[in-house]
């Protein structure tokens, strides 16, 4: 009995060790970019037409409908939408070089984390946390022996409208709280901010610490309708030439409700909407005009 009682406290202490470490004892591993965005739909067939036919991405095996943008980025659709009032965004995931170390790092910074990092359906290591506004944010470490690793270089058809998700965005109500999480703890940095007027801040681009993808805070949004949430909670696909991308969509008879335009950030963009109103923004990565409101940091 004595031995059993003496061992249990030691085992408990070992299990809790990551959470008890001082902040400086665990270094943040690299966070290199957007890994995936997961969305709700109530019509997988319509989603497949939009992401597979109109946008030209290849569907790969997985739950729901999974579309491959490149070897490190995916768009996932799940038939979970039960009401038009629901938010379509399930989560956004970022790629890290070490999921376990990142989990321990977040625990050391008093972020609630799962008990352990686990392999997901695709064989990669991943875990999720909640940001200060309750949004699910995931982190993925790609493994060479996973389903995605074994499919490296495959399912990348010439029909794809884009080769990269360059950013995702969602509604932010409390910028200071979100900054404490994304900037102060995770290491994201402001790349550009702009607004509908020169002195307003309606959009804030926060670049990942070890890459060029970014998160766009969508600020000053009050009581959004389902359509407004779809506009704000969005993803952006980089295209090298907007005119060519627009023509490809026309040739595929895609539903186009808007025309290409130059945004406040000086970049060509074209807004598309999937069957459940989530905005998919096509964007040329480089400004063709001087961005409004603030200087834009150049790519790393």
Which positions does each model-derived feature cover?
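Vicinal oxygen chelate
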Residues: 2, 6-7, 16, 24-28, 32-42, 65-68, 81-107, 125-130, ...
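Core segments of cupin and vicinal oxygen chelate
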Residues: 29, 35-75, 122-125, 169-215, ...
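Sec-exported extracytoplasmic/periplasmic mature domains
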Residues: 52, 56, 98, 107-111, ...
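Conserved short beta-strand elements that form part of the metal-binding/catalytic scaffold
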Residues: 57-89, 136-144, 191-229, 272-273, ...
């Amino acid at each position: 009995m004595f031995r059993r009682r003496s061992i249990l406290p030691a085992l408990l202490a070992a299990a809790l060790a990551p959470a008890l470490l001082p902040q400086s004892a665990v270094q943040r591993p690299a966070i290199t970019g957007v890994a995936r965005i997961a969305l709700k739909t109530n019509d997988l067939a319509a989603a497949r037409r939009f992401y597979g036919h109109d946008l030209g991405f290849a569907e790969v095996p997985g739950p729901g409908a999974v579309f491959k943008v490149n070897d490190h980025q995916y768009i996932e659709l799940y038939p979970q939408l039960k009401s038009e009032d629901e938010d379509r965004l399930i989560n956004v995931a970022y790629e890290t070089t070490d999921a376990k170390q990142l989990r321990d790092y977040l625990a050391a910074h008093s972020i609630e984390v799962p008990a352990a990092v686990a392999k997901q359906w695709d064989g990669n290591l991943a875990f999720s946390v909640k940001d200060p506004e309750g949004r699910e944010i995931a982190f993925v470490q790609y493994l060479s022996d996973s389903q995605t690793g074994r499919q490296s270089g495959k399912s990348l058809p010439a029909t794809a409208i884009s080769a990269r998700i360059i950013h995702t965005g969602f509604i932010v109500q409390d910028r200071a709280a979100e900054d404490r999480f994304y900037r102060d703890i995770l290491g994201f940095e402001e790349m550009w901010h702009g607004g509908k007027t020169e002195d307003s801040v309606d959009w804030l681009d926060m670049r990942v610490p070890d890459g060029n993808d970014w998160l766009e805070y969508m600020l000053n949004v009050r009581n959004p309708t389902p359509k407004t949430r779809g506009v704000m909670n969005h993803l952006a696909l980089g295209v090298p030439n907007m005119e060519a991308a627009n023509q490809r969509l026309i040739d595929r008879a895609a539903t186009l409700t808007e025309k290409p335009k130059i945004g406040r950030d000086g970049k060509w963009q074209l807004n598309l909407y999937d069957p459940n109103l989530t905005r998919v923004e096509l964007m040329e990565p480089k400004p063709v005009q001087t961005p409004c409101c603030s200087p834009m940091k150049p790519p790393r």
